[in-house]
């Protein structure tokens, strides 16, 4: 459960294949919108903090756009975690 974009947002991790289906939580270069009904910047920060714990080699397949990896997302993920805010 990775709320933030919406209350019911989820990400699915297939550890055996190293694939993270990140939905509308994590995209190449950023995160999903939080200005929709049920969206929450605070919940998104908490969700991104959980995803930031994954290994850099995990491939993220978002609901839109191109794929990325946790490692490629590390600079902005670490900034969000350090600030505990999407205002980075």
Language model segments and positions:
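Metallo-beta-lactamase
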Residues: 1, 6-88
């Amino acid at each position: 459960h990775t709320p933030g974009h919406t209350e019911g947002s989820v990400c699915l991790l297939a550890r055996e294949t190293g694939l993270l289906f990140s939905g509308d939580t994590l995209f190449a270069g950023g995160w999903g919108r939080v200005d929709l009904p049920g969206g929450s910047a605070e919940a998104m920060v908490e969700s991104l903090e959980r995803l930031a714990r994954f290994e850099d080699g995990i491939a993220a397949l978002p609901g839109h756009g191109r794929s990325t990896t946790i490692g490629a997302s590390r600079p902005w993920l670490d900034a969000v975690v350090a600030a505990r805010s999407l205002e980075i």
